[in-house]
Amino acid sequence: MASVGLQLLATVLAIIGWLGEIVICALPMWKVTAFIGNNIVTAQIFWEGLWMNCVQQSTGQMQCKVYDSMLALPQDLQAARALVVISIIVTFMGVFLTIAGGKCTNCIEDQDAKAKVVVAAGVFFLVGGILCLIPVCWSANSVIKDFYNPTLSDAQKRELGASLFIGWCASGLLLLGGALLCCQCPKNEGRAYSVKYSAPRSAPGAYV
């Protein structure tokens, strides 16, 4: 098994990525208005998230409203809801397995079993990172495509919100942490091999 420091590094990276997933799930900052308008006094900034949208006035006051229906969301945000929630759950399971199989814990006595549990945790982190990366990239692609769509007015166009950048960082940390843990796959060096022993044949005249 690899060193305790490598395991701790991978675990810390994954936990930070997991917290980033929770942040992007909660914050309504996936999309933001691209154009404020000519009148700064009456300007409004619109934020769109997975669960609510918010309006920020020029005075700094912000009002948020939960979506009345899931069907009111665009396809990318509908998929992002499910994928981000699943990613948070999968990553949490990976954190639990990492703690259970860590070299500095005594939850599992067998060292080979510990190594397998840690590798399984790495797989969970990789899956969680991919599940988080898909909706973030999908939403970013949708924002960029609509931004350059000539049929949409300036008020309908959006820019990339802070949640998308946080999501990219969180996915990268999860993928890195998962890769570090998967590199700790146990080797088969200690496996015992059975050696067949054949007794030497005695010569015909040995007992004469």
UniProtKB/Swiss-Prot annotation:
GO terms for biological process: bicellular tight junction assembly; calcium-independent cell-cell adhesion via plasma membrane cell-adhesion molecules; cell adhesion. The chain crosses the membrane at residues 8-28, 82-102, 117-137, 160-180. Signal peptide: none annotated. InterPro entries: Claudin (IPR006187), Claudin_CS (IPR017974), PMP22/EMP/MP20/Claudin (IPR004031). GO terms for cellular component: bicellular tight junction; plasma membrane. It is found in: Cell membrane; Cell junction, Tight junction. One of its GO terms (molecular function) is structural molecule activity. The keyword Lipid metabolism does not apply. It is a multi-pass membrane protein. Keywords: Cell junction, Cell membrane, Membrane, Tight junction, Transmembrane, Transmembrane helix. Pfam families: PMP22_Claudin (PF00822). Component of tight junction (TJ) strands. Belongs to the claudin family. This is Claudin-like protein ZF-A89. It comes from Danio rerio (Zebrafish).
